[in-house]
Amino acid sequence: MPWIQLQIPADPDTADQLEDLLMEMGADAVSMEDAADQPLYEPDPGTTPLWSQTTVTGLFQSDRNIEQLLADIRDAWHQQTQQSLADIDVTLVEDKDWERAWMDDFHPLQFGERLWIVPSWHEAPDPDAANLLLDPGLAFGTGTHPTTALCLEWLDGQDVAGKQVTDYGCGSGILGLAALLLGADHVVGVDTDPQALEASRDNARRNGVEDSRLDLYLPGQDPDTRADIMLANILAQPLIGLAPRLAELTRPGGHLVLSGILFNQAREVMDAYEPWFVMDEPEQKEDWIRLTGRRKDG
């Protein structure tokens, strides 16, 4: 059975409302995509931005009357906004195993020489490597974004055996778990989102990591444990505000690894950390950079 696919262009002010309308009209699924291949840069605190050009896509069952469906959507939109909705692209798409098609798009990813991120349905390409089982599509990070890749590549290039690691803003736990698989002794993960902490714990168990090797906390509840390696893949402004706390939690001589920073933000972030760390030159991947440094004595 084919599906009726409706695609409607929207701006950031109307995309959420349009998504709700399509669901009210009986869509089986609604998604939003970037219509112009634009990156989303750092948002203001408390905002959830969308692209300046967004395509809202709704899938409807094929037994719907298309002309009536379009008329109902346009009428409802006009009632809600007093605006017209003329530009609706209609196509019929084949019915297929969408989950299988989605899974086929994702393959194991290698970071450096020793580390792989492997979707759970794939065989590990190198059974002797550090293979982190992690499924794409999680909201909290799976290694596909340049900011995460920069951190994973750094970890792969280090001797982390026996080290104490803190992953501040841990999300899925990807960085801390990678460190553990590469030989770190213990990881403290911190995140503002309780669901992220749950995701980290679930991923740890999936990878056979003992609970005793990974402690997870909300900010303000984490102990004053000083790390040999401090990882923080967040965003520039939160990183700037966290500089004193991350310095406090890093032992003298310990490594600092920061990501989630755009190239033009590097200097401001480096300035925030230089009172406590000797900072290295930035490492860039696409529009993003990684900052590293060593904790000064004292």
Curated annotation (Swiss-Prot):
Q: What CDD domains would the database entry show? A: AdoMet_MTases (cd02440)
Task: Show the GO MF annotations.
Answer: protein-lysine N-methyltransferase activity
Class of enzymatic activity (EC top level): transferase
What Enzyme Commission number does this protein have?
A: 2.1.1.-
> What compartments host this protein?
Cytoplasm
Which of this chain's residues are annotated to bind S-adenosyl-L-methionine?
148, 169, 191, 233
Its biological purpose is as follows: Methylates ribosomal protein L11.
**Which family does the similarity line name?**
Belongs to the methyltransferase superfamily. PrmA family.
Q: Which HAMAP family match?
A: Methyltr_PrmA
- What is this protein called in UniProt? Ribosomal protein L11 methyltransferase
Q: Which gene encodes it?
A: prmA
